[in-house]
Amino acid sequence: MSTTVLFEHPLNEKMRTWLRIEFLLKQLSASQIIVDHQGALTFFRNAGELLDVFERGELRTEILKELERQQQKLLSWAEVPGVDMTQIEMHRAKLKGCATSLIAAPRMGQLLREERLISLVRQRLSIPGGCCSFDLPTLHIWLHIEQQLRDQQVAVWLDSLAPIRDALMLLLALIRQSGILRTHTSLNGFFQDNAEGADLLRLQLRLEDALYPQVSGHKSRYAIRFLPLDSERGEVPARFNFELACC
């Protein structure tokens, strides 16, 4: 069992959206083997929420810009003496490949939008108990077809998300790796600092302290207040060490 807990907090709307997409993609992957009604509703609810997020802003454009920005960062690293050029070229090739795939891909989530079953379930999810067999006979019979056929259909849906998934996972990995966890000290449960040019805060706390961070901030500055998990009897130490990475 882990003795630490890692928290992440976005410092801009772009990163907030990306983290939500990552969360939903992971939920879809974890629930892709659908064997019953409960599992189906979990999958379709996540699919519907993902399509809702896809509707917000210039998502593809922002990701393509970040892919280009990360390539430029790698080029600047190439000028550092002793740097591993093999790693730099490998990452640049991955970034270029993701950009090419994303440019060539249709509208994000288009296959899921056009899938009649997903559309039917999505319409009923907002109604309390609205996904009973008499409400959605299509889903009811789909859950009784052979498991292999159902798995194949779900796999096709998820494969259609590969361009956005691969690009986003690579970008988030590079962004997370750009910051190193360092020890800091909060005074009376409070800490603040500058975050010029950063997209993401990562905080690692000891589980035994039973504290969690409440973060407020934007692209230039942030503040963290630590609160006890037990709001009635818990206490926050006057001085409290934690690890923080500004990415």
Swiss-Prot record:
InterPro entries: ZapD, ZapD_C, ZapD_sf
Gene3D superfamilies (alphabetical): YacF-like, YacF-like domains
Signal peptide bounds: none
One BP term from GO: FtsZ-dependent cytokinesis
Domain of life: Bacteria
GO cellular component, one term: cytoplasm
Location in or out of the cell: Cytoplasm
Cross-referenced Pfam families: ZapD
Alphabetical keyword list: Cell cycle, Cell division, Cytoplasm, Septation
Record's keyword annotation contains Cell cycle: yes
Subunit structure: Interacts with FtsZ.
Family listed: Belongs to the ZapD family.
Protein role: Cell division factor that enhances FtsZ-ring assembly. Directly interacts with FtsZ and promotes bundling of FtsZ protofilaments, with a reduction in FtsZ GTPase activity.
Record-linked NCBIfam families: PRK05287.1-1
Protein name listed in UniProt: Cell division protein ZapD
